[in-house]
Amino acid sequence: LTDPRKTTEAQAQALLKTAKPIYYITSGIHSPENGGPEMLIELAYRLIVEETPFIQEIRNNVITIITPVIEVDGREKQVDTYYYNKTRAPGDARLPLMYWGKYVQHDNNRDGMGQFLELTKAVTRMQLQWKPTIMHDLHEAQTYLYSSTGTGPYNDALDPITISEWWMLAQNDVLEMTKRGVPGVFTYGFYDGWVPNYMFFIAHTHNAIGRFYE
């Protein structure tokens, strides 16, 4: 389906009836953000062993690929820092994560175009090999949950269909979480949707959908 040079129109139409979408979830690119890596381990476990109709539907109809930690060295340092701080006496100052990301730290998520970092190259190889339908990068910025759409102006290279799909997915997130009584889930007002150097934009340059949570 990804290469019309190898697949005829008739073959593509037949594949559409049986092929499963691939949902690729990543997290841990920013080492001080702890929630995503922890949650993805739990999610992987539930997808494997849980037998509820909800999980069975996902397991039967979607191929889910999970990379719980993109920046593995920084994650190790974050874990070490956390356990060191637990040894500090009550009232003592807690040390922040002093060094991670091989000089770039938070800007390792600004390498989607330059492709200078090994972690970016690894994600690109993943995209090229598995061709996921959606790449979903998990972050952590506040006590709320932001599902990405952007305020605009959107990047000129983005197809309007892609922007509509952003909104469709985000609105479904907000609807489903609200239906389950989860407060603080929102979209729109967090970033603009213009700068194409985020890691999830790798998906957009390979005919897929990139999105993120904060």
What are the roles of these predicted feature ranges?
Residues P4-T8, L128-I134, Y188-T205:
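Conserved alpha/beta core surface patches that mediate binding of polyanionic ligands
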Residues M135-D137, A170-G189:
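Acidic/polar loop patches that form or flank catalytic/metal-binding clefts of enzymes
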Residues F54, F116, F186, F190-Y191, ...:
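Phenylalanine-focused residue identity feature
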Residues T2-I29, N34-M168:
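Active-site/substrate-binding loop(s) of hydrolase catalytic cores
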Residues P96-L97, G112, K179-G184, I209-E214:
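Acidic/His-rich catalytic or pseudo-catalytic neighborhoods
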Residues M98, D156, P160-S164, D173, ...:
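Primarily the internal scaffold of c-type cytochrome electron-transfer domains
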Residues Y144-T149, W194-E214:
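Active-site-adjacent mobile loop/cap segments within catalytic or ligand-binding domains
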